[in-house]
A protein has these predicted regions:
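Extended glycan-interaction surfaces of carbohydrate-active proteins
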Residues: 1-35, 71-168
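Well-ordered alpha-helical scaffold segments within catalytic/enzyme domains
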Residues: 38-59, 107-118
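Flexible, glycine/charged-enriched surface loops at secondary-structure junctions
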Residues: 60-61, 138
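Short, charged, amphipathic alpha-helical segments
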Residues: 63-67
Length: 168
């Protein structure tokens, strides 16, 4: 847990999220830092833990967890909202903010405790539907991204290098 109460994970050469494709020493989708879906899961874990504490009549501990969850939400909104594009950054690592449009941000609006509301949530859903939704599933990158690979096939190198680069 970082000073801003968000979770930081990973290190150079290591993949810790579901987008874990690696070819030799090459990390195809580097996501070191604060991944959007990890923050959404963290926020929900804190809120659920607080609810369990309340059910067990541990009000002081529940208040502490809810306070931590509010800090997470505040930090998340300050660091992850990409106002220029109307959706969430995929990963934040210090001053670097990865603006790749990926489906990972759906966790922030689809779990029981959402991190976005109103216009922001609507914007995320609208853009994901327009750019990532297909009749057979969600793309992991939009077709207009220069890294987009629409077909998963070929030898091991081609498959691994295309794995999380758009194929639905």
């Amino acid at each position: 847990v970082d000073d801003d109460e968000l979770l930081y994970s990973g290190e150079a050469g290591v993949q810790l999220t579901w987008m874990d494709a690696k070819v030799g020493d090459w990390v195809v989708t580097p996501r070191t830092g604060k991944a959007v879906e990890i923050q959404a899961l963290w926020y929900n874990a804190l809120r659920i833990f607080a609810a369990l504490l309340e059910m067990n009549k541990e009000k002081a501990a529940a208040d502490k967890m809810n306070g931590k969850a509010e800090q997470v939400k505040t930090s998340f909104l300050n660091k992850f909202w990409n106002a220029a594009d109307g959706y969430l950054y995929d990963v934040v690592d210090g001053d670097h903010k990865d603006a790749s449009l990926r489906p990972n941000q759906l966790f922030a609006v689809s779990l029981p405790f959402t991190l976005l509301e109103g216009k922001q949530a609507h914007s995320v859903l609208k853009i994901v539907e327009q750019k990532l939704y297909t009749p057979v599933g969600l793309r992991t990158l939009p077709a207009d991204d220069n890294r987009y690979v629409g077909v998963y096939g070929g030898d091991q190198l081609k498959r691994d290098s295309s794995y999380h680069q758009g194929t639905a």
